[in-house]
Amino acid sequence: NWQEIISKGFRERLDKFQSFSLFMDICVRCGACADKCHFFLVSGDPKNMPVLRAELLRSVYRNDFTLAGKLLKKFAGARPLTMDVVKEWFLYFFQCTECRRCSVFCPYGIDTAEITMMARELLNLVGININWIMDPAANCTRTGNHLGIEPHTFKKVIETLVEDVEDIPGIALNPSFNRKGAEILFITPSGDVFADPGVYTMMGYLMLFEHIGLDYTLSTYASEGGNFGLFNSNELMKKLNAKMYHEAERLGVKWILGGECGHMWRVINQYMDTMNGPADFLEEPVSPITGTKFENAKSTKMVHIMEFTADLIKNNKLKLDPSRNDHLNVTFHDSCNPARAMGILEEPRYVIQNVCNNFYEMPEEPIRENTFCCGAGSGLNTEEIMDIRMRGALPRASALKYVEEKHDVNTLACVCAIDRATLLALTQYWAPDVEVAGVTEMVANALVMDGEKEVRDHDLRDEPYLGVED
């Protein structure tokens, strides 16, 4: 009865989500989005145009839920739900990374990512999904993070990173875990804790917080900021996101600080307050170091690490030596969700320009809100579709290759854990001499800490600072 299951699920979601119902009806097929999708640009497949990808779903909608479709059938652009249609859904809705670049150019503001979310949710009802989405989601349900790491192991890994990083400045770092009464709960994607190169970003957080004396704690239960429910099911997204609020309430913190992640921030900025809020038990975030009130986080009670760090720099609370990053020629990749779903555009650039002397922008067309996707977001970072991923990443790779050749760029910075995982494959294929790094990693490189050892000659990756190797 798979057809019945999908049809019933379709009806329920049309009734529940007003935006989905609206998006099914208002598209005029103008084609403004057609050449904005990286997968269409590189494949030339018309069904990878956002408008025609959505038509795969709309055609069934017309057939089952509109009078014109029921009467006129194919003359109204309607078609029945068959197994071939389901196969098309699987093929094309898993070639959408939910990056929302097409939505920027849509004159009606249609969010094609939400159409993809609904299509995947319908497929999931009949057991059609991919392991790279389901496995992390199941792990997060079971242990609180995508990798399925138990609380005691999470704590041990952080302590190991502390041991590794303490030798660089020569200063003891003192993170706390599950500490009740801390002012701030810090939550970051598990990729920053367990995956290279994300671990260097985690080291950067630890050094930064120690330097400013931040009263924060980590949770071994809400040990994941990312949310694979966004790629799979609204109910699962709500469930996974709830753990952050529940843990913040249990620990009695004032507000939440979030690390460098992508889809984590779309969920927080666009869905969190209505899904799991209001978080009346938390306070409107105020920096304990500068006194700045983060008014944009008034409802969610959660602040992005780039906003927090940019505010520290603006108020002269960090002593920085940008020359410590002179061995890096840096460009910046605007991660889709922080950029388009949250508007974090200038803060990372402001931070980078204050901690690096050599920063070069990619061409204007594929950056900021027009940024091209890494090619493997929304759970598509899986080996068996590597050929599709590399094609999808070509527009971003082309811009990267341009600045690499023009400015000898050797570092691609980003503020997304999935980017730090997916861009490794991209750079290895398209730009082998370029490393991928988090912005907070470079902040820690430049950070002049109180009481640090007299000669600090290596960065977080144990690479010598420029001139030291001589």
Task: Tell me the role of every PLM-derived stretch.
Residues 1-29, 38-75:
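N-terminal cysteine/histidine-rich coordination modules
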Residues 35-63, 104-123, 379-393, 421-432:
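Iron-sulfur (Fe-S) cluster-binding segments and ferredoxin-like electron-carrier domains
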Residues 27-33, 37, 96-102, 106, ...:
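Short cysteine clusters
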Residues 15-21, 54, 58-291, 461-470:
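Iron-sulfur-cluster electron-transfer modules
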Residues 301-352:
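C-terminal amphipathic alpha-helical segment
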Residues 109, 193-291, 337-354, 360-470:
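Cofactor-cradling patches in redox/metallo enzymes
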